[in-house]
Amino acid sequence: MNHFLDIHLTDPADLREIIDQAAIMKSARKGRPRGAPDDTQPLKDRIVALIFEKPSTRTRVSFDVGVRQMGGQTMVLSGADMQLGHGETIADTARVLSRYVDLIMIRTFDEAVLTEMAEFATVPVINGLTDRTHPCQIMADILTFEEHRGPIAGKKVVWSGDGNNVCASFLHAAGQFGFDLTFTGPQTLDPDAEFVELARSKGVNVAVERDPAKAVEGADLVVTDTWVSMHDAQSARERRHNQLRPYRVDAALMSRAKPEALFMHCLPAHRDDEATSEVMDGPQSVIFDEAENRLHAQKAIMRWCLAV
């Protein structure tokens, strides 16, 4: 049994196995209807609980479709259904769910909820997102980069904007996959120093550059994310916009990267805030391949967790 809680907690050889498996499974589905089953049915007779304390479009749909394609069934539970930690303890919830289902995916706010769920569950637990990390997204991003440009090892990735949970998982991935990462953004939104040092301890170059034009020079991949939550108050949105406007990814900024550089954004996006529509819809953008690859990467993660 394998939990998938964070990239830095997973052996590099296992991460490579997941990426390679995802690529094989994606290739095998070419030309098939979305609802057609995979040739192999590794999740036949398996039930996967999908827990959403924090709502999502991509995570819910991609996991649900992936389970169905592999022959399994899903049980979707919202925060209102569960009330995690506000009645029954998380530990007891984990123990009970483990008697009903074969795998648990949880998308939550507090990483401590994820950690406790994994500690007491007797089935694998997958981190669908926390406020601290988002490893499934980065596995999809690496799959996307490698299908367009080959191995990511030794490449330069630039993160522009807020050093948030997706940025944190990119830092973890840098150490495990062997690519360099430059963060460019305001000092008040720097990524967690603990994550920076962890990546550096693996021998990769992690740099902080306040000037975005300098940061993206020679980049193989430029990545950003939404500046504000879709649910943030207007005052918070205005404050973040003032801080982050210099770090918007536009055509002028992308021109400083390598000509073959790719652009990624995990979506949803506030178009023309963190990135211009010109870039998002341009030839260097792979944002919709990236979104599709959530499906394939997560299918491979589930197979790895269950060893099927």
Swiss-Prot record:
Major localization listed first in the record, in broad terms: cytoplasm
GO cellular component, one term: cytoplasm
EC number: 2.1.3.3
Binding site for carbamoyl phosphate: 56-59, 83, 107, 134-137, 266-267, 294
Record-given protein name: Ornithine carbamoyltransferase
Catalytic activity, as annotated: carbamoyl phosphate + L-ornithine = L-citrulline + phosphate + H(+)
Keyword list, A-Z: Amino-acid biosynthesis, Arginine biosynthesis, Cytoplasm, Transferase
Annotated Gene3D superfamilies: Aspartate/ornithine carbamoyltransferase
PANTHER family reported in the protein's UniProt record: ORNITHINE CARBAMOYLTRANSFERASE, MITOCHONDRIAL (PTHR45753), ORNITHINE TRANSCARBAMYLASE, MITOCHONDRIAL (PTHR45753:SF3)
Top-level EC class: transferase
InterPro entries attached to this UniProt entry: Asp/Orn_carbamoyltranf_P-bd (IPR006132), Asp/Orn_carbamoylTrfase (IPR006130), Asp/Orn_carbamoylTrfase_sf (IPR036901), Asp_carbamoyltransf_Asp/Orn-bd (IPR006131), Orn/put_carbamltrans (IPR002292), OTCase_ArgI (IPR024904)
